[in-house]
Amino acid sequence: MAQVQYRGTGRRKNSSARVRLVPGSGKIVMNNKAIEDYIPFASIREVVLQPFNVTETLGNYDALVTVRGGGFSGQAGATRHGIARALLEVDPDFRGPLKRAGLLTRDARMKERKKPGLKKARKASQFSKR
C-alpha cells in the first residue's frame, strides 16, 4: 500500500522549497542531506522547526525538502512556510495556531534593487559641501 504523504510549497526571498511530510520519527532531510549537515547554524535550524513546535507535532513526521535559490536564511524561511502548508493538509484544525504564529503568510520582503548613481540600493558616495 502507498505511504501517506502530505505536500507543501514554501517561498521566502529568492528561495523556493518543496516539502513532503511522511509519518515518521522527526528526521528532516534537505536536498538529500540531514538538516544538521545542510544548515550549520542552530538558530536558523530552529526556524525550520517552528511549525512543528506550534502544532506540537515535533517527532511525528519526517520532512523531505527540496530547496533552491537564496542563502541559509531564505531557504530556512521557505522550508518553514512549506512545512506549515503541509501540516494544514495533515489536519485543517492546525490553521488557527499556524495563522496566529504567522507561519502561513508568505513573507513578501525582498532585496531592494540597486539604483543608478548609487553604490548599493541606498548607499551613496560621501557628500562634500565644499
Curated annotation (Swiss-Prot):
InterPro entries: Ribosomal_Su5_D2-typ_SF (IPR020568), Ribosomal_uS9 (IPR000754), Ribosomal_uS9_bac/plastid (IPR023035), Ribosomal_uS9_CS (IPR020574), Ribsml_uS5_D2-typ_fold_subgr (IPR014721)
Entry's Gene Ontology molecular function annotations: RNA binding; structural constituent of ribosome
Biased composition (Basic residues): 111-130
Region named Disordered: 101-130
Keywords: Ribonucleoprotein, Ribosomal protein
Source domain of life: Bacteria
Pfam families referenced in this protein's UniProt entry, alphabetically: Ribosomal_S9
Biological processes per GO annotation: translation
Cellular-component GO terms for this entry: cytosolic small ribosomal subunit
PANTHER family hit by this protein: RIBOSOMAL PROTEIN S9 (PTHR21569), SMALL RIBOSOMAL SUBUNIT PROTEIN US9M (PTHR21569:SF1)
Similarity comment: family membership: Belongs to the universal ribosomal protein uS9 family.
Protein name: Small ribosomal subunit protein uS9
